[in-house]
């Protein structure tokens, strides 16, 4: 079985060079709406307009007094909601928020008043202010035990760490989630995607072997990762000179016509010295574009950096017929505008977008949700632009 022998396969390095450009760029894996930042910023602006500066200052002074551990005053839900949507990018406000959260969490342990879930909202505040270090510190603070125990909180924190290049910290957060033994799925799809993205960006032997172990664990548990997780793992395998693993991994996706999958497959084949097998893939997109899954027509493109790798692989073969056929295919791709200047790395790291649909199910699994109520709401699904992400 492939999964059981995967870690051994990871050690079979076939080539000494990297084949993908692993560019570090400050971008998130979720669009703002997908993690609820749009709603957070809406209410933030609403509060900013609702209160005058003197009123805000008076509120801060009162809350600073109430948050004192020696004070008998309580921090109520509305108090904390207001400061979380009011806090600015300064030490005074951030310290006040921290003090209020700790007191609120302590006074409510064992008995929750109301049904407002603060963890995701607080993480959105830190995301908005771009404070990954503070967010991580509070996440690990024993005084905040139970405060961030929500799937949404983990995903927002990990995405914040991702855009700031803190990939090791993402793996640390995931290990912490495992140790807490929370009542959530063993392999949450969104969390696993961020973990495999971090391993891809780290691009080290250790992180790749860790990714291999996680992949094997998921396969043995019967878990089906989302396509974005699969492509991160496959690209990581290519960068770690294991294109044979990349080819095996992407076969788990039923529809092989997605842009990222085709590009990765071509790179892997070239890296294995099987450029003759890559030519039919390049040639296949020259036919008339067909709608995918009943949706709109999707132009089947190849990345410029992938095409350059194909050219380099062809030169190593020194085969005249191969060169002529490749030139013919590439000329047609150019004429049809089917070679994109977008890099494969950019495709891999493109944002997951939100698609809304009416639903009345529980909101706990929704990244953008803040309340735990039974009233109808628009459930958010996370998809790549125009195509379904879940397999």
Question: Could you say what each language-model-derived stretch is?
Answer:
Residues 1-391:
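A basic, Ser/Thr-enriched alpha-helical scaffold prevalent
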